[in-house]
Amino acid sequence: VGFEITKESYAGAIKGITIGKGDAAITVGGQTSYPFYQFEGEMPNKPVVAMEIWDIEPAEWPEAAIAPFKDVVGDPAAWAKKCVEEYGADLIVLQLKSIDPNDQDASPEDAAATVKKVLGAINVPLIVWGCAAPAKDEDVLKKIAEECQGESLILGPVEEKNHKGIGAAAMGYGHSIISSSPIDVNLAKQINILLENLGMPLDKVLVDPTTGGLGYGMEYSYSVMERLTMAAMTQGDDKLQLPMINNLGNEVWKCKEAKQTVEDAPELGDPERRGILMEAVGAVSYLMAGSSILIMRHPESIKLAKAFINLISDGGTALDVAPITKQLDDVEIDFAALAAEADLTMETEKKAAPAKKTAAPKKEAAPAATPEAPKAAPVNNADAVEAAAKSLGIDLAALLKKRGCSKEDIEHTAQQHKLTVEQVIQKLNS
């Protein structure tokens, strides 16, 4: 009998969505099964990796994250061009950090000018990501949508508070959007319903379920993404049958563990390799949860993520994947010196210390013998029955003859039924 893989049947599929324009356009989504379950369905479009750039020079990035871009971090257009030409980015994500009202609070006009410069430097689709302040994002993204009409941008994040303004601008000027919700299946569906009611075609919408870095945050995000995928695929919920996008790099590299130097945490090993692997592990996790677009930062992390995508999609061996290429100097860590000193003495070799001689404790005087209680005289049950009958004024001999019983029978009956002898005699006499 041949072996057959048990296959799940699906009630729905993820919509295929095309982003960008012309020859540079990319289609994501379109799968008819769970992520990479190609034995159950089709996955016509592999997940893609978008490289992030910032519109300002990052002040708090760890050295490992800055190193690949140290010559271009002050120029967003040059930065984007390097990501495409040198590192093979499928898409570019422009993070508008300058517009944060709590930071530089740059104007919509300045942000739009930066977007135009970046568009002129690349030939791949561009995602424009706001600062997650709903009111400011609405003002800025509406202006960018207008200034970049026909460029097929992807604008986000779009929340319930600003979906009308950004959604209308995206529809009017020919852009796609990213609907964002705070790690909640129902809220993710709700924002898509609101956008559809507004008139936004769902084939122009990507879903941002909110992304956590490694650890507790990622577990939350992963769980919600699985539930979104299950609702779309097995329950046929058309409001959730949309490709998902994860802003991963921004979350991983701001973690304390990704920033700590070898002096701060020598036990965590080489900081450069550590950060790269943290981002790569996060990427694999989100790919398995159903991500169609990963926003990442470090070129070496991206290399590992793309290798995973190709291996799991097309087969092959991971032995062909090039090792991590370091850009910073190697660090020397004496892990043996960090470890606690081990006690290698065998248990049988350890000699117990001789016990100290102590004076023998004084013997306590034996307690005086308790005098034995006098033994009670044995009770004559027959006498007790006769005494009871006499006290009741009953002729015991005549009663026993009449009832055909003995004194022992009366005593036994009293014990069995928990009665007094007097009660038994009275019952026999009645």
Model-based region annotation:
Residues P47-I53, D90-L94, L126-G130, E151-P157, ...:
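Hydrophobic faces of well-ordered beta-strands that scaffold small-molecule active sites
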Residues K161-F308:
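Catalytic alpha/beta core domains of metabolic enzymes, predominantly
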Residues V1-K70, E332-T348, P354, A359-A360, ...:
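N-terminal amphipathic alpha-helix/helix-capping segment at the start of soluble metabolic enzymes
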Residues V84-Y87, V115-A121, K142-Q149, I166-Y173, ...:
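Acidic (Asp/Glu)-rich catalytic clusters
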Residues E60-A67, G88-K117, I122, V128-P134, ...:
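Glycine-rich, proline-tolerant flexible connector loops at the mouths of alpha/beta enzymes
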Residues A50-A78, D103-A106, G130, P134, ...:
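Active-site mouth loops of central-metabolism enzymes
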Residues D71-K97:
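Catalytic domains of carbohydrate-active enzymes, especially glycoside hydrolases
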